[in-house]
Curated annotation (Swiss-Prot):
Entry-linked PANTHER family: SMALL NUCLEAR RIBONUCLEOPROTEIN F SNRNP-F, U6 SNRNA-ASSOCIATED SM-LIKE PROTEIN LSM6
PROSITE patterns in the cross-refs: SM
One annotated GO molecular function: RNA binding
Source organism superkingdom: Eukaryota
Gene designation: lsm6
Keywords: Cytoplasm, mRNA processing, mRNA splicing, Nucleus, Ribonucleoprotein, RNA-binding, rRNA processing, Spliceosome, tRNA processing
Sm domain segment(s): 4-75
Assembly description: Component of the heptameric LSM1-LSM7 complex that forms a seven-membered ring structure with a donut shape. The LSm subunits are arranged in the order lsm1, lsm2, lsm3, lsm6, lsm5, lsm7 and lsm4. Component of the heptameric LSM2-LSM8 complex that forms a seven-membered ring structure with a donut shape. The LSm subunits are arranged in the order lsm8, lsm2, lsm3, lsm6, lsm5, lsm7 and lsm4.
Organism expressing this protein natively: Schizosaccharomyces pombe (strain 972 / ATCC 24843) (Fission yeast)
GO BP, one annotated term: maturation of SSU-rRNA
Keyword Nuclease attributed: no
Coiled coil: none
Similarity section: Belongs to the snRNP Sm proteins family. SmF/LSm6 subfamily.
Protein name in the entry: LSM complex subunit lsm6
Amino acid sequence: MDSSPNEFLNKVIGKKVLIRLSSGVDYKGILSCLDGYMNLALERTEEYVNGKKTNVYGDAFIRGNNVLYVSALDD
């Protein structure tokens, strides 16, 4: 088990993640980088609203204050 959120986030860079926003919208993609404010950059991003895929993006940038949680996904 990871000892801190930062340790977990650094461990999942380059891996597929699920990001849930406070609005309830989900993004799935490859976490490419993040900063100290938890702003996130994703590659090969899919957007899900109410469980349905609504958009596909090459790259997406998500502002950290909108993030409810980040979860690692199986490859």
